[in-house]
């Protein structure tokens, strides 16, 4: 058996517990502030550029297993799409006109699709106000409803996704668990060739969900 940890806040306790009870310690994602040799196995994302080690497996996308919460239901004979909006960060700036042009394009190009949208804690009030101008069939504005996460429902029913490039976890989660077409919304970038761009490139080269079972068979515990 093993102790599995995911995220910077868990690695120390995983190491402590595994040593105390003589268990194998497995880290999901790259534990950058720790000695990699402290872990029996590390499962890291390729866009983090992990070094080659015997105890490290680099995978294209994050391990994830979303489940629908029932916020929306599949309507038979109706196609649907989801728009997932992030916001400014240290690399990207989200211009108002970029999102407006993309939303205009979506509503013009897909008039018969059901349209869903969700924002994030980084989405500006200006972008939230813009989203409110459109007639989405289902809408979650993070600043108003921070405790609702509809991503599992979107993954279960949507035929297309439009996701801003800054939203790496959402890009990874959707591609890992859905065969739907993913359209990445480009933003103004302060730097090039970052891990965000690397992940976007990986996703653009994939047209179906990831077979985690096949990949993880390489790990022997």
Q: Where are the model-predicted features located?
A:
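A donor-sugar binding/catalytic signature common to diverse glycosyltransferases
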Residues: 151-193
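Active-site and donor-binding regions of nucleotide-sugar-utilizing enzymes
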Residues: 1-57
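Nucleotide-sugar donor-binding patch of glycosyltransferase catalytic domains
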Residues: 175-218
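A short helix->loop->beta-strand "cap" motif at the edges of active sites that frequently abuts
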Residues: 21-24, 39, 112-113, 178-181
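Short, charged/polar "capping" segments at the starts of alpha-helices
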Residues: 34-35, 50-52, 91-93, 122-129, ...
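Active-site donor-binding acidic/aromatic loop of nucleotide-activated sugar
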Residues: 138-146
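Active-site donor-nucleotide binding/catalytic segment of nucleotide-sugar enzymes
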Residues: 64-125, 143-144
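Short internal beta-strands
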Residues: 42-45, 114-121, 183-186
């Amino acid at each position: 058996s093993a102790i599995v940890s995911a995220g910077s806040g868990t690695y120390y306790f995983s190491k402590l517990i595994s040593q105390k009870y003589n268990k194998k310690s497995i880290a999901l994602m790259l534990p950058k502030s720790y000695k990699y040799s402290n872990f029996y196995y590390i499962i890291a994302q390729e866009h983090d550029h992990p070094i080659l080690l015997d105890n490290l497996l680099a995978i294209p996308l994050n391990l994830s297993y979303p489940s629908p919460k029932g916020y929306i239901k599949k309507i038979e004979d109706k196609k649907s799409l989801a728009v997932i909006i992030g916001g400014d960060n240290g690399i990207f700036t989200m211009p108002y006109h970029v999102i407006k042009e993309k939303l205009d394009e979506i509503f013009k190009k897909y008039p018969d699709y059901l349209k869903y949208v969700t924002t994030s804690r980084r989405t500006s009030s200006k972008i939230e106000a813009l989203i409110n101008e459109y007639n989405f069939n289902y809408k979650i504005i993070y600043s108003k409803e921070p405790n609702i996460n509809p991503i599992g429902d979107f993954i279960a029913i949507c035929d297309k996704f439009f996701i801003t490039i800054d939203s790496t976890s959402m890009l990874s989660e959707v591609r890992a668990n859905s065969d739907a077409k993913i359209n990445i919304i480009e933003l103004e970038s302060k730097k090039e060739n970052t891990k965000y761009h690397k992940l976007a490139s990986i996703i653009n080269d994939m047209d179906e969900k990831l077979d985690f079972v096949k990949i993880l068979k390489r790990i022997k515990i």
